[in-house]
UniProtKB/Swiss-Prot annotation:
It catalyses: ATP + H2O = ADP + phosphate + H(+). Its main location: nucleus. SUPFAM superfamilies: P-loop containing nucleoside triphosphate hydrolases. Residues 132-142 have a biased composition (Low complexity). ATP-binding RNA helicase involved in the biogenesis of 60S ribosomal subunits. Binds 90S pre-ribosomal particles and dissociates from pre-60S ribosomal particles after processing of 27SB pre-rRNA. Required for the normal formation of 18S rRNA through the processing of pre-rRNAs at sites A0, A1 and A2, and the normal formation of 25S and 5.8S rRNAs through the processing of pre-rRNAs at sites C1 and C2. This is ATP-dependent rRNA helicase SPB4.
Length: 725
């Protein structure tokens, strides 16, 4: 078991040392949550945000940014002398995803629902200090209970809010938390304009601001919201990275903001300068080098090694596409080696309710190293979603946007806890990604290759034989349901598309992409029909011929590893879907296709015959006669040849002359009669076809002439001489 990573110390100091001090009821809630000290970002942000200052906060993921804006909003709400009236909004928090908005809402809800009502003062002791100054006047004289806090609870405005206006009118919230599109629709809808009053708005918070502003749709909605709100407000931007879009927004929407940048530095030996980093100090950030064909194998071994040897119990595995998450969830959950793992699928194409259920199932699972929980997901769970107990993050695919790397890795080692992150990199050029990240202040250390005995070794020189074994195991699973084969092909294609759109394309080059190797890792039955694969095979064959030519000329050639591929032996006509409905639809399609094929064959044969007849009809009479003459000449030559052969036999003394002459004469007579019958039949058939075609041509001509006469006036000349033909 590796040595424990020490928890990162909180350099922000005690909550009691804040100036101005926080309200006692807020401190009580913070203490009940187990936070004894502030993080640096909280110590730097809260005092300024409580005062009348706009804040732009840049800090590493997992540094406590949520409390850094939640506490100032509540403190300003608590210090307000005049209570907010029904329908008035005190603060709006905008988050890029539904999951992040839900978690922020849960934090606000925890604070506001924990207040002690003043009516219970005689029973609970002195609570005067716990209550805000306007507590007695902020509610009607009706008695209050613990179920009715001093402040209205916050309202969540996302796709999961079915009746937002009814909820707003029944609860009268002062704080709104939601996603950009839903908030913009809620506030700017005519009904929202009538019942939601923002003239007294105090604070606007943009969490994960770089992601909010990187999406054109999100940015448009954020700008609409900001234009609707009063200019005399506090605006706070929080993010782990600052982009040009964020800088532009700072100039447009903030007034003299204070910048708060929290950097982490590694401790060094005497004489060494500390290095700045953008990941938590308690994070063991690593990379593992393997062939693409070995990636799924290494993923499985990492899960087994970390859970068995290091007793890790909660994992997140990131893929580049939703299709890959869906496919690998179905495959990995059926592998016997991972039977003790509880797998959950989570990606952006799932309906909101299912996403919410999946996230809840994963976070609430009582995981242990004997029954670990694994979340297979895309970048929808890379930012903002707060997982407090993640032990290991594995990146099956490096993120398309390098800025996302620190957000993915930051799902572990949060709030001072230790954690580990591993990114799987292909052998070769992809190893340059380590230096690329180091320049971006994200240092990585090497995670050794894991062999079949879960031992750490060097990357093998040849393809791990277990990769082929795993390929056959996955294929056996796929062969149980044709739908899995469809999903495998879809995930393979989508993974390549994501690879081709990588921002670090000078490292992740499509020219170096090995389709055979990737197909082994995905367990495909056959390579999908992609133009890129066809081009790749041509280039591969041309390169092979070039190297062979150099070898034949005595030149030296650097041997490159070639990973061969062989399609599985599958009868695709009988390979069935497990779903009866889908299989019935497939069989119906096959039958329809067969009928169409036979109909098409008959139609093509008829078209060929018609073209031949038309071509012969278009021939001049002299050419037709000449063709018949040539045919007769060929037959006469054939008869003359046979006669010559017979005479030659007679000269050599072979055969009976009289009987042979009789046979030849009889055969010639029969051929002549048969030829005459064929010519008569042919002439009759041609005559019928000719008459039929002539009739069709005449009808077409008549229609054209009549339409021409009706449109342009020359109606008499249009068809008056048709009968003279």
């Amino acid at each position: 078991m590796d040595a424990p990573v020490p928890a990162a110390p909180a350099f922000g100091g005690s909550w009691a040392k804040l100036n101005p001090p926080l309200s006692p009821w807020i401190l009580d809630v913070i203490n009940s949550m187990g936070f004894k000290n502030m993080t640096p970002v909280q110590a730097g942000t809260i005092p300024r945000a409580v005062k009348n200052q706009d804040c732009v906060v840049e800090a590493v993921t997992g540094s406590g940014k949520t409390l850094a804006f939640t506490i100032p909003v509540l403190e300003r709400l608590s210090r307000r002398e005049e209570p907010y009236k029904k329908g008035e909004i005190a603060a709006i928090v905008v988050a890029p995803t539904r999951e992040l908005a839900t978690q922020i809402h849960a934090v606000f809800h925890h604070f506001l629902s924990s207040l002690i009502p003043p009516e219970s003062e005689e029973e609970t002791g002195d609570v005067e200090a716990h209550a805000p100054p306007f507590a007695s006047s902020s509610r009607s004289p009706s008695p209050q209970t613990p179920d009715k806090p001093l402040f209205p609870l916050p309202m969540l405005v996302t796709s999961g809010t079915p009746t937002p206006y009814e909820t707003f009118q029944s609860t009268h919230p002062s704080i709104l938390i939601g996603t950009p599109g839903r908030l913009a629709a809620f506030l700017l809808n005519p009904r929202g304009l009538a019942i939601v009053r923002v003239s007294e708005l105090d604070v606007l918070v943009l969490d994960e601001a770089d992601r909010l502003l990187s999406s054109p749709d999100h940015r448009r909605d954020v700008e609409r919201i900001m234009r609707h709100l009063p200019k005399q407000r506090r605006t706070h931007l929080f993010s782990a990275t600052m982009t040009d879009a964020v800088e532009e927004m700072i100039g447009l929407g903030l007034r003299n903001p204070v910048r708060i940048v929290v950097n982490l530095k590694d401790k060094r030996k005497d004489g060494e300068e500390p290095k700045e980093r953008r990941t938590p100090m308690a994070l063991q950030n690593t990379y593992l080098v393997c062939r693409h064909a070995e990636k799924t194998l290494q993923l499985i071994r990492l899960l087994l090694c970390e859970s068995t040897k290091h007793e890790r119990s909660k994992f997140i595995v990131y893929f580049s596409t939703c299709a890959a998450v869906d496919y690998f969830y179905r495959i990995l959950s059926r592998l016997p080696s991972l039977s003790k793992f509880h797998l959950t699928s989570f990606h952006g194409e799932l309906p909101p309710k299912i996403r919410e259920t999946a996230l809840s199932t994963f976070t609430s699972h009582p995981s242990s190293h004997l029954s670990p929980a694994v979340l297979l997901c895309t970048d929808v769970a890379a930012r903002g979603v707060d997982f407090l107990d993640i032990d290991v993050v594995i990146q099956y695919d490096a993120p398309t946007d390098p800025k996302t790397f620190s957000h993915r890795a930051g799902r572990t080692a949060r709030a001072g806890r230790r954690g580990k992150a591993v990114v799987l990199l292909g052998k070769g050029r992809e190893e340059d990604y380590v230096d690329f990240l180091n320049i971006r202040k994200i240092p990585l250390t090497k995670q050794p290759y894991i062999n079949a005995y879960l031992e750490e070794v060097d990357t093998p020189q040849a393809l791990d034989p277990e990769a082929t074994t795993l390929l056959h195991s996955i294929r056996q699973i796929i062969l149980t349901d044709r739908e899995l084969s469809d999903k495998a092909a879809k995930s393979f294609v989508s993974a390549f598309r994501a690879y081709s759109k990588h921002e670090a394309s000078f490292i992740f080059r499509t020219l170096d992409f090995d389709f055979n190797s990737q197909a082994i890792s995905f367990g495909l039955l056959r390579l999908p029909a992609m133009p890129e694969i066809k081009d790749w095979k041509k280039k591969k064959e041309a390169e092979r011929q070039r190297l062979e030519k150099i070898k034949s000329e005595g030149g030296e050639v650097e041997e490159k590893e070639i990973i061969e591929w062989e399609d599985a032996g599958v009868n695709w006509d009988t390979f069935a879907y497990a779903s009866r409905q889908r299989e019935a639809a497939r069989l119906a399609t096959l039958a329809q296709r067969a009928d169409n094929q036979s109909s098409n064959d008959a139609a093509r044969a008829e078209a060929r015959a018609k073209r031949k007849i038309k071509a012969e009809m278009r021939e001049a009479w002299s050419e037709q006669k000449e063709r018949k003459v040539r045919k007769e000449e060929r037959k006469e030559k054939k008869d003359a040849k046979k006669k010559y052969e017979w005479e030659l036999e007679q000269a050599n003394g072979e055969g009976d002359r009289q009987s042979d002459l009789a046979n030849i004469a009889k055969a010639q007579a029969e051929r002549k009669k048969r030829r005459e019958r064929e010519e008569e039949s042919w002439d009759e058939e041609i005559g019928k076809e000719y008459k039929s075609l002539k009739r069709e041509i005449k009808e077409e001509k008549s229609v054209k002439e009549s339409s021409k006469g009706g449109a342009g006036g020359g109606g008499i000349g249009g068809g008056m001489f048709d009968d003279l033909e």
